[in-house]
């Protein structure tokens, strides 16, 4: 069969035929430090880092190369804590946390327009892309525990602040 459409349409079909590479690159790092300053003071600090890049991960069957995407994820976070035992019956715990995450999804075809042909294929930029999200998270937690005989009382608070900027 011969395609009789405009040259640009025929070129789109040719560019979206065949086998396309799928590459992924992921790096992760974590570090935790624990310190017992005294019998009543214990500290910890943990840092996590992940960087991940994927290309053409959704190219398959009817999804053409021009519709496929490239994703970039960066996730970085720190959490620290302090436990203070004022007495065997009275313990105070404090935790602080910070996290930054970006999740970027970019199309291979940045200009569009979206072209969907049922039963044949999906081409060009998805209507909802690119998607660029940045999330930030801050958390403070405080807990005071008191034990007496068979009873245990726990008081505390948790403050969580989150922000999400999506384009």
Regions found by a protein language model. Name each.
Residues 1-167:
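Short acidic-glycine motifs
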């Amino acid at each position: 069969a011969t395609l009789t459409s405009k040259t640009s349409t025929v070129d789109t079909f040719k560019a979206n035929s065949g086998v396309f590479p799928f590459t992924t690159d992921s790096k992760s790092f974590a570090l935790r430090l624990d310190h017992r300053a005294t019998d009543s003071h214990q500290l910890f600090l943990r840092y996590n880092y992940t960087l991940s890049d994927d290309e053409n991960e959704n190219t398959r069957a009817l999804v053409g190369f021009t519709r496929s995407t490239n994703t970039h994820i960066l996730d970085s976070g720190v959490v620290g804590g302090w436990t203070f035992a004022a007495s065997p019956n009275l313990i105070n715990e404090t935790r602080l946390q910070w996290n930054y995450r970006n999740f970027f999804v970019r199309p291979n075809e940045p200009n569009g327009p979206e072209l969907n042909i049922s039963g044949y294929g999906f081409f060009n930029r998805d209507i909802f892309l690119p998607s660029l999200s940045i999330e930030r998270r801050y958390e403070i937690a405080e807990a005071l525990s008191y034990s007496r005989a068979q009873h245990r009382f726990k008081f505390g608070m948790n403050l969580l602040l989150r922000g999400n900027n999506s384009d």
